[in-house]
Structures are given as structure tokens and as C-alpha cells.
UniProtKB/Swiss-Prot annotation:
<dbReference type="GO" id="GO:0005737">
    <property type="term" value="C:cytoplasm"/>
</dbReference>
<dbReference type="InterPro" id="IPR036603">
    <property type="entry name" value="RBP11-like"/>
</dbReference>
<dbReference type="InterPro" id="IPR022905">
    <property type="entry name" value="Rpo11-like"/>
</dbReference>
<dbReference type="GO" id="GO:0006351">
    <property type="term" value="P:DNA-templated transcription"/>
</dbReference>
<dbReference type="InterPro" id="IPR009025">
    <property type="entry name" value="RBP11-like_dimer"/>
</dbReference>
<keyword id="KW-0963">Cytoplasm</keyword>
<dbReference type="GO" id="GO:0000428">
    <property type="term" value="C:DNA-directed RNA polymerase complex"/>
</dbReference>
<comment type="function">
    <text>DNA-dependent RNA polymerase (RNAP) catalyzes the transcription of DNA into RNA using the four ribonucleoside triphosphates as substrates.</text>
</comment>
<dbReference type="GO" id="GO:0003677">
    <property type="term" value="F:DNA binding"/>
</dbReference>
<keyword id="KW-0548">Nucleotidyltransferase</keyword>
<dbReference type="InterPro" id="IPR008193">
    <property type="entry name" value="RNA_pol_Rpb11_13-16kDa_CS"/>
</dbReference>
<keyword id="KW-0804">Transcription</keyword>
<dbReference type="Pfam" id="PF13656">
    <property type="entry name" value="RNA_pol_L_2"/>
</dbReference>
<dbReference type="GO" id="GO:0003899">
    <property type="term" value="F:DNA-directed RNA polymerase activity"/>
</dbReference>
<dbReference type="GO" id="GO:0046983">
    <property type="term" value="F:protein dimerization activity"/>
</dbReference>
<protein>
    <recommendedName>
        <fullName>DNA-directed RNA polymerase subunit Rpo11</fullName>
        <ecNumber>2.7.7.6</ecNumber>
    </recommendedName>
</protein>
<comment type="subunit">
    <text>Part of the RNA polymerase complex.</text>
</comment>
Length: 95
């Protein structure tokens, strides 16, 4: 299971680590953030992944960097996460 480790946080920037993730949440979150007004930078990096012995998935701890201007970084991050949840909910309803 993934969880978030906040590395650094200020009003206009957040750097966080998504523990035991791959590109799935990291990329979706980056794309959602880039669509938001006031986002200056939304990017993530992934170290070389390792094979998880229980799941057989390649995992890593991607680091996401968000920088904003004129809007609180935490607020934009929460909006982007809600957008991803809404997208998944809509997909489930259509099945």
C-alpha cells in the first residue's frame, strides 16, 4: 500500500515521496496538477525500481515536486487528488 511522506512544505511548494508506488499515481497526479491554475512546476522523479517480493510489481519511491504562484500548494494538491478520485469513481459507475 502506498503512503505519502512530506519531505518539505511551504505555502507555495511541496515536495513529497510516494512510498512503494510506481508511475501510476505519480503520473496521474502530475498531469492533474499541471491542469490547475497557479501551478508553476509539477514534476516527479523515480529512482531505479526494485521488484516487490510479494506483489511481483516493480516499485520505487517517486518524489513529486509542486510549486505554485498565487495559490496555496496544499490546496492545489488536494484538488488534484480529488479530481483523480472523481475520475476513478466515474469510471466505476460506467462499468
Amino acid at each position: 500500500m502506498s503512503y505519502i511522506n512530506i519531505i518539505e512544505k511551504s505555502e507555495n511548494s511541496i515536495e513529497l515521496e510516494l512510498v512503494n508506488d510506481d508511475h501510476s499515481l505519480s503520473n496521474a497526479l502530475k498531469e492533474s496538477l499541471l491542469s490547475k491554475k497557479g501551478v508553476v512546476i509539477a514534476s516527479y522523479g523515480v529512482e531505479h525500481p526494485v521488484l516487490h517480493p510479494e506483489t511481483g510489481r516493480y516499485i520505487s519511491n517517486p518524489t513529486l515536486v509542486l510549486k505554485t504562484e498565487g495559490v496555496l500548494a496544499e490546496k492545489v494538491l488536494k484538488e488534484a487528488l480529488r479530481d483523480i478520485i472523481d475520475l476513478c469513481s466515474n469510471c466505476l459507475e460506467e462499468l
